[in-house]
């Protein structure tokens, strides 16, 4: 009986580790500019102000059959913030907002990925302005397949919302401007 139990536990353990081994690793396609990290925030409640981070890197693992094995890691150079307005960008880099001198990077590391119908719920830790908080992103697989250059690609779009005060950004922008919407679109190249 003990021998059968040990064999069963060994088989289950091997199957579990085999599932995580099937998750393929993808690196963000930065060379072809097929990855974007954008944000928007309400301006006085009258309109949207859009911006992006132009310097970042990341990778993810993806296994459609076992999403719980998937991982996402992103590193953002906060100095690369760009809202198409030099003075505003300078202000956003200051200690009142991103404090890029003290906190030159923001990071996101997933802690859990779940399939939700055709979509994915990605939960992870976002570190921004020296503060780490859990964040949930709603992601969609846009497509995947072989490219003309002999690689295999997968593309996703993820969206989420963060509260500025959660990341110690307390500059008063008015009641309509307390949250930032994140839009992340990435195309990953599967590593061989």
UniProtKB/Swiss-Prot annotation:
Matches recorded under Pfam families: YceI
Record localization: Periplasm
Signal peptide: 1-23
Disulfide bonds: none
SMART domains, per the entry: YceI
Alphabetical list of InterPro entries matching this protein: Lipid/polyisoprenoid-bd_YceI, TTHA0802/YceI-like_sf, UPF0312/YceI
GO CC term, one of those recorded: periplasmic space
Keywords: Periplasm, Signal
Primary location recorded for the protein, binned into one broad class: periplasm
PANTHER family, alphabetized: PROTEIN YCEI
Assigned protein family: Belongs to the UPF0312 family. Type 1 subfamily.
Identification of the protein by name: UPF0312 protein PC1_2518
Native source species: Pectobacterium carotovorum subsp. carotovorum (strain PC1)
């Amino acid at each position: 009986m003990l021998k059968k139990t040990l064999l069963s536990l060994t088989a289950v353990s091997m199957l579990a580790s085999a599932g995580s081994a099937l998750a393929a690793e993808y690196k963000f396609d930065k060379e072809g500019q097929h990855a974007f990290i954008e944000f928007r925030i309400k301006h006085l409640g009258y309109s949207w102000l859009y911006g992006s981070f132009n310097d970042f890197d990341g990778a993810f693992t993806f296994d459609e059959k076992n999403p719980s094995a998937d991982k996402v890691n992103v590193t953002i150079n906060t100095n690369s913030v760009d809202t198409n307005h030099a003075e505003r960008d300078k202000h956003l880099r200051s200690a009142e907002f991103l404090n890029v001198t003290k906190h030159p990077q923001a990071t996101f590391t997933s802690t859990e990925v779940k399939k939700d119908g055709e979509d994915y719920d990605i939960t992870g830790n976002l570190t921004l302005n020296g503060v780490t908080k859990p964040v949930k992103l709603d992601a969609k697989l846009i497509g995947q397949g072989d490219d003309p250059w002999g690689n295999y690609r997968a593309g996703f779009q993820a969206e989420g919302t963060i509260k500025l005060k959660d990341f110690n950004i307390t500059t008063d922008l008015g009641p309509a401007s307390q949250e930032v919407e994140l839009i992340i679109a990435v195309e990953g190249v599967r590593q061989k």
